[in-house]
Amino acid sequence: MKLFVYHTPEATPTDQLPDCAVVIDVLRATTTIATALHAGAEAVQTFADLDELFQFSETWQQTPFLRAGERGGQQVEGCELGNSPRSCTPEMVAGKRLFLTTTNGTRALKRVEQAPTVITAAQVNRQSVVKFLQTEQPDTVWFVGSGWQGDYSLEDTVCAGAIAKSLWNGDSDQLGNDEVIGAISLYQQWQQDLFGLFKLASHGQRLLRLDNEIDIRYCAQSDTLAVLPIQTEPGVLKAYRH
């Protein structure tokens, strides 16, 4: 299993895809996806474009649905939900399809949607991701951070490191790029205080300015949800069933 870390979707190679792509947007899209599916949502369907989400939802008739939209850290007008994972309670989302668009995470999913296997990771479901990769043993794994509008993000990188640390056997042949070691090192330095790191991160600072420390604390928890979101068709994620 060869591991690669890419800090943003723009940093990924354009002429190839991995056997398995792991998309990460800890603050907050992939945390919200994991939380929604763990709470019983039928699926999460992602849209990079807000207009596309509204147009699609107007014709959708197969299952009950909720629209979840976020831009700049705030809920989009006309959507029932924003991008707060804490809104995804069983009472709210069970049996429903979540139509989701966010500033960064949905763009990262779009970049790798043609890979044979696409899963999403966050701190909350880290161990489920590790177990899946240890079992499936894909030849190449890309950890794709969502970043913030094309820029590096601490929280996505440290999550990639948290997963890669459990997969790396110490053999240099497993390292696809230097970013893997950087991510693992960041996790080793901050693993006892991820909440503190997230508050220092630029997107954590944005959420703090929006008076949303509680979401940061939620997203900084590790291994609290036994759920693995996996793409079943382009843009559609469901809970993986063994």
Curated annotation (Swiss-Prot):
One GO MF term: magnesium ion binding
Source organism of the structure: Picosynechococcus sp. (strain ATCC 27264 / PCC 7002 / PR-6)
Membrane-crossing segments per the record: none
The name this protein goes by in its record: Probable 2-phosphosulfolactate phosphatase
Catalytic reaction(s) noted: (2R)-O-phospho-3-sulfolactate + H2O = (2R)-3-sulfolactate + phosphate
First-tier enzyme category under EC: hydrolase
A Pfam family reported for this protein in Swiss-Prot or TrEMBL: 2-ph_phosp
Keywords, sorted A to Z: Hydrolase, Magnesium
Needed cofactors: Mg(2+)
Domain of life, per lineage: Bacteria
Coiled coil segments of this chain: none
NCBIfam families: PRK00886.1-5
Similarity field: Belongs to the ComB family.
EC number: 3.1.3.71
